[in-house]
Amino acid sequence: MSYVASNIQVLKGLEAVRKRPGMYIGSVSINGLHHLVYEVVDNSIDEALAGFCDKIEVVINSDNSVTVNDNGRGIPTDVHEEEGISALELVLTKLHSGGKFNKGTYKVSGGLHGVGISVVNALSSFLAVIVSRDGKLFKQTYSRGIPTSEVDIIGVSSARGTKVTFLADSEIFETLEYDFETLSKRLRELAFLNDKIRISIEDRRSGKEKFLEFYFEGGIKAFVDYITNNSKNIQNEPYFIEGSCDDVIVSVGLKWTEGYSDHILSFVNNINTREGGTHVAGFKSGFLKAMSEAFRDSKISKKDVPSLTLDDFKEGLTAVISIKIPEPQFEGQTKGKLGNSYVKKIVETIVHDGLLKVIDDNLLEVDIILNKAIRAARAREAARKARESERKKSAFESLALPGKLADCASKNPAEREIYIVEGDSAGGSAKMGRDRFSQAILPLWGKMLNVEKTREDKVITNDKLIPIIASLGAGVGKTFYIEKLRYHKIIIMADADVDGSHIRTLLLTFFFRYMRELIENGHVYIAMPPLYKLKYENREHYFYDDLEKEAFLGSIETGKRDKVSLQRYKGLGEMNPTQLWETTMNPATRKMKLIKINDAIQAEKIFVTLMGDDVEPRREFIEQNALDVVNLDV
């Protein structure tokens, strides 16, 4: 297929980008900075989807500029008839210009964020593009979207491709420091979704040198294996379904584990559709029909089995759904949800027919999966009965807050916060030291439940979790409603030792599995009590890590250091109410960590590794991360 200037279609100019960058890249924070890289990489991926590129290299240079190099056809350099300038300059200086807007050039495009590489150019203090094409090497440079050179021929080349180097504009962005892990996560994702494309990322910044390369022949199947590699799997290999209809290409990978949570990832043209859409609705419909038919036709006894639902069949399932579609219609600027209505029926049919074939080829494994679904249905019924039992209690009983909760006076959830505190003694100090208007205290006691190894019916009736569920007031699991949340800050306060770390992890696992919106909406925090109290010249100083402590000690004259009194806190109970308030609870001076999910796949893997049944992955994880541990209780 030819790719020349006439394939470049212009929609409108570039004037507004620098004035309102947030409209085009979401924000001028580090997320917007990363968005620039994704835009350039998306152009290379479009070439790969069209069958002309199989290698993409990303380099973070020592000066915080970024280079993206591919072996595609190279951006055309001939003159565009309507515009009277080279196609290369057109693509880099006009908003919404590019081959992806012309159906004849790319049937499927992933880089259609409503922006394109011209926005990267507009928001860069410097950009250079080198094109290898037609036996020649072309180069043009820009500053803040304005050409600073002509399209010059700088040599000959037997290769082909496009190399873009840009330095984001410090006048626009809050930071120019890229996060290697965030970029590599997205590039790994792209390599899974587009098998047999080799994508590498290199960090050349001083002290941060790193290199990663991603190449997966298995594509979606390899993606599913990657997500589930620390889980106890029911299948040896992921099931794979693919098909196409009316230019819609559907690929689905499925694998069941022995766990209780399901994990469904969906993509349209390589874009993560976090809110789902018609393709996910089609998947669920086709999946439910096929699994219901498999159960109906199986030899498994149907006696006393509740009616099996989608959730029952999904228990322990990891699925990756990827579709390629010529003209996706996304709802919202974030591309969070696919809206093309005709896609649902196509995906439903392909998944239904493909899954039935897979089932016929794997009857023994499928019997294990169906029996798992039956156990899930029985647990669901038990959970329903437990909820009904709670509802049948008097209104006073069912709404009663736990007796150990010391609530606060404010009625406004936005200004209310709850400290979930390990131990009665620390809870007592916290109750005495708190701000009674806005701070509630809920002490924990006894052994916490590991929800990773427990079905929902056991979770919602657990005597250690019921006080937390009741205090927060928003329900749990499938009946969790964040608008009912009684506190907008949920602060986990535990000792700075191994037991405290374990309690924090158990609570975070519970929130992640049964109240994930708490984390997604920024409501969960970890309190950071000090590790040391240092007394010197009748003044007390608190330090939260060894670096702070050593820096302070280093500032004291050598001869006076014997006058320093140093205490290392092992537990919260060692502090009196005033000290606990001053160091850990006073909003003006305290330190807290906000819990965020930057990488949902990695979070899933870590919770399964740390809290699941399999010991070996947990041992490996601890060995690999032991060097990163700052305070280790032995």
UniProtKB/Swiss-Prot annotation:
Task: Give one Pfam hit by family name.
Answer: Toprim
Question: Might you name a Gene Ontology BP term for this protein?
Answer: DNA-templated DNA replication
- Annotated binding of Mg(2+) 1, by residue: E422, D495
What is a single molecular function from GO for this protein?
metal ion binding
The catalytic activity of this protein is classed by the Enzyme Commission as 5.6.2.2
Gene3D superfamilies the UniProt entry points to: 3.30.230.10, 3.40.50.670, Histidine kinase-like ATPase, C-terminal domain
Catalytic reaction annotation: ATP-dependent breakage, passage and rejoining of double-stranded DNA
> Which positions in this protein are listed as binding Mg(2+) 2?
D495, D497
Q: How is the cofactor bound?
A: Binds two Mg(2+) per subunit. The magnesium ions form salt bridges with both the protein and the DNA. Can also accept other divalent metal cations, such as Mn(2+) or Ca(2+).
UniProt-annotated site: Interaction with DNA, residues: K447, N450
Q: Which keywords accompany this UniProt record?
A: ATP-binding, Cytoplasm, DNA-binding, Isomerase, Magnesium, Metal-binding, Nucleotide-binding, Topoisomerase
Origin superkingdom: Bacteria
Q: Which InterPro entries does the record associate with it?
A: DNA_gyrase_B_C, GyrB, HATPase_C_sf, Ribosomal_Su5_D2-typ_SF, Ribsml_uS5_D2-typ_fold_subgr, Topo_IIA, Topo_IIA-like_dom_sf, Topo_IIA_B
The protein's required cofactors? Mg(2+); Mn(2+); Ca(2+)
Localization in the cell: Cytoplasm
Looking at the UniProt record for this protein, which Gene Ontology cellular component terms does it annotate, in alphabetical order? chromosome; cytoplasm
What top-level class of enzyme does the UniProt entry assign? isomerase
The Toprim domain covers which part of the protein? 416-530
Function field = A type II topoisomerase that negatively supercoils closed circular double-stranded (ds) DNA in an ATP-dependent manner to modulate DNA topology and maintain chromosomes in an underwound state. Negative supercoiling favors strand separation, and DNA replication, transcription, recombination and repair, all of which involve strand separation. Also able to catalyze the interconversion of other topological isomers of dsDNA rings, including catenanes and knotted rings. Type II topoisomerases break and join 2 DNA strands simultaneously in an ATP-dependent manner.
Q: Which HAMAP family match?
A: GyrB
- Extra remark beyond the main annotation: Few gyrases are as efficient as E.coli at forming negative supercoils. Not all organisms have 2 type II topoisomerases; in organisms with a single type II topoisomerase this enzyme also has to decatenate newly replicated chromosomes.
Similarity comment? Belongs to the type II topoisomerase GyrB family.
Its quaternary structure?
Heterotetramer, composed of two GyrA and two GyrB chains. In the heterotetramer, GyrA contains the active site tyrosine that forms a transient covalent intermediate with DNA, while GyrB binds cofactors and catalyzes ATP hydrolysis.
This chain's protein is named: DNA gyrase subunit B
Q: Which organism is it from?
A: Borrelia hermsii
Upper lineage is: Bacteria, Pseudomonadati, Spirochaetota, Spirochaetia, Spirochaetales
